[in-house]
Amino acid sequence: VVNKPRNKGTSAESAVVAYLRDNGFPHAERRSLTGATDKGDISGCLGLCIEVKYANSGLKLGPWLTETRVERFNSRADYGVLVVKPAGLGDRNTAYWYAVMIGEEFAELSAKAVANSPAILQIKHGEPTTLNTTVLRAQLTRGIQPGQLAGYELLALTMRPPGSKENPDAWYRVLTLSHMVRLVRAAGYGQR
């Protein structure tokens, strides 16, 4: 019996591994399942816990980020990154998949990255908006179009999950995978 959801997840993980290997993380590989002490889907990215989700049936960022955070602690990683394959973006567009972090961790990581590379990295922050798949895709697509960002800028959208209106540390920060990789590399992760 073929397990289609598992096959889709495996395919998404493999696409992320290929992208990471081509962009400064040559030791990235799919991690075998470890049950209750799961440490994320991708290993070989020292200091990072990377969880990958195939989201054709909708975004479940809250539960997925909770899972990513638990796996981050299990793996003793510095940061947890949730990579989401959205509907309509196949393996050839892995660079445009969503990379999501909790606001508190993103603030720490981005401060580190900007401190390491102040002349070559700036983060363009999107206005906080409520969590909505259509809005997210439209803002990311529009924000990364040619002419919207300087070569040294990264776009980080801000999504407010329900009940977090006054707590920016709990907001979700959403980038494309290509922008997240540039951010973590600027913060000192991956090969130099």
Identify the function of each model-found stretch.
Residues 1-192:
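Catalytic phosphate/metal-binding cores of nucleic-acid and nucleotide-processing enzymes, i.e., regions
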